[in-house]
Amino acid sequence: MKLAVYGKGGIGKSTTSCNISIALARRGKKVLQIGCDPKHDSTFTLTGFLIPTIIDTLQAKDYHYEDVWPEDVIYQGYGEVDSVEAGGPPAGAGCGGYVVGETVKLLKELNAFYEYDVILFDVLGDVVCGGFAAPLNYADYCLIVTDNGFDALFAANRIVASVREKSKTHPLRLAGLIGNRTSKRDLIDKYVEVCPMPVIEVLPLIEDIRVSRVKGKTVFEMAETDQKLNYICDFYLNIADQLLASPEGVIPLELEDRELFTLLSTFYLTVTPQNQGETQSTISTPLTSNSASELDFILV
């Protein structure tokens, strides 16, 4: 099984990915996590340090693939989860998608790409070009990490569009959304009501998850010395169980930008008993013609 994890930048994809990887390993699977971000910090909480990237290793070998060994690029982290960082081109130059392709090519050369039960691609923020959608070419399922906010759901909708496009030529499905760092899910529910897709799990805002990232550990590793954290691990184990059940997945149909803006803006600008106190911006009048004009201006 190959998974690609996407979501708005800063939404907690890497932390979520690492904990899902451990959860899958706890279920007896051999797991490889591939970080697909030039920051090369995806696997930090698995290994405890920033591992060398594949691109750095290839450059050091003058791109002679035959001189690269598995131990040069694959590092085993906590829970026996193997880790790879694709790395990326210098800022403002090159293509991140090309780097992902080179990573997969090298792993195949090393006969490592097919040795795992699960390969998880942790991809940088929003899909802004076809290059960063490259991991979808290899994935069976896409997971989208979001929160209960406007920006994250807008980014999720763009990723949904990429999944739909890639599904035309690849056996790719959207496994569903993972809500992260949110005690509410009203906006998420509003979105999936109009754009049907599964919601796999919703994790509340838990300080210990943030602390785990700072410490360079997964929640599972921290729970070894603090059993009070076991309930957090259960969230990720639930996600793993659903994925291992081979979900049918969906080929979603994204909303048009204007439709999504209208849907979410109307929700934010209308106070109801359901969203009273749940959104940061609550105005006592619904979306008016003036508001619609402002929306038109935003979307120009």
Swiss-Prot record:
UniProtKB keywords: 4Fe-4S, ATP-binding, Chlorophyll biosynthesis, Chloroplast, Iron, Iron-sulfur, Magnesium, Metal-binding, Nucleotide-binding, Oxidoreductase, Photosynthesis, Plastid
Residues that hold [4Fe-4S] cluster according to the record: 95, 129
Cofactor descriptive note: Binds 1 [4Fe-4S] cluster per dimer.
Coiled-coil boundaries: none
Annotated ATP binding sites: 10-15, 39, 180-181
Superkingdom of origin: Eukaryota
Residues bound to Mg(2+): 14
Function: Component of the dark-operative protochlorophyllide reductase (DPOR) that uses Mg-ATP and reduced ferredoxin to reduce ring D of protochlorophyllide (Pchlide) to form chlorophyllide a (Chlide). This reaction is light-independent. The L component serves as a unique electron donor to the NB-component of the complex, and binds Mg-ATP.
Name of protein: Light-independent protochlorophyllide reductase iron-sulfur ATP-binding protein
Gene transcribed to yield this protein: chlL
